[in-house]
A protein has these predicted regions:
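His/Glu-based metal-binding/catalytic segments typifying zinc-dependent metallopeptidases
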Residues: 50-110, 114, 144
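Charge-rich, well-structured scaffold segments of protease-associated domains
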Residues: 1-52, 119, 124-229
Length: 229
């Protein structure tokens, strides 16, 4: 483990020098006005090289179903997490990420309807989807809810049934998909007004080596082209 007094020296060892970093700067100004400030800032950063020779190159993930059950006291509630992951990327990463976000929103709507409205056994359902290209591709979808311990099996079975139904009869979810796409486009119109959106987008595009700048220009068209199938 890492001791507290070792954390800052380790950080400086790995990330202290500015060499080979890419800086993303946004501002309502001209390059002529801000260039002296950028030069002064970067020129004042520590020089030298970072110690990054060691790289973690692979992920060891299980390829079969497994369960982890832990009893933590006498609480009358059970916290359930279903995790699905894969390591095969069959399309462009940006397209995969967008479709994952669509799937996440659709799945949450379906599970809320089934587990809360129909079964009445949960207050809410969380669905999260994430993916990364490095050190090797891995995507993960997580479904979570809190329920009575005696309801765990029936809720897990119902969740799996909804996943199977979404896979076998995608056209029956067209109404939900339409709402999801409409909300994505609304969110995009708001997000693109924020500097934080652009800095994160540029940073992630450079880091992932996915510098397709036309993607944002064609975002609405791409979203509208997604079908349930």
């Amino acid at each position: 483990y890492v001791k507290q007094e070792d954390m800052l020296p380790l950080f400086n060892r790995f990330y202290g020098a500015a060499k080979d970093y890419t800086f993303v700067i946004l501002g309502d100004c001209t390059i002529q006005d801000i260039k002296p400030l950028i030069t002064t800032y970067i020129g004042g950063l520590p020089k030298g090289s970072n110690d990054t020779d060691w790289c973690y190159t692979e992920r060891n993930i299980p390829y079969k179903s497994c369960s982890l059950i832990r009893h933590t006291g006498d609480s009358p509630k059970a916290s359930v997490s279903l995790i699905f992951q894969q390591d095969s990327l069959l399309e462009e990463f940006s397209s995969f990420t967008l479709k994952s976000n669509v799937m996440k929103a659709m799945l949450r709507t379906c599970l809320l309807n089934r587990l809360r409205e129909e079964m009445g056994k949960v207050y809410s359902v969380s669905v999260a989807a994430s993916a990364g290209l490095y050190p090797s591709f891995l995507s993960r979808t997580m479904i979570g809810f809190v329920c009575l311990p005696e309801d765990v099996d029936s809720l897990v079975n119902a969740t799996q049934e909804e996943l199977q139904r979404l896979y076998e009869y995608p056209e029956s979810f067209d109404g939900i998909l339409t709402d999801v796409k409409r909300n994505l486009l609304k969110d995009f119109e708001l997000d693109k007004q924020k500097n934080s959106f652009w800095t994160s987008w540029i940073r992630n595009s450079i880091f992932n080596q996915q510098e397709d700048w036309k993607y944002l220009n064609n975002y609405a068209q791409t979203v509208n082209s997604i079908t349930a199938k």
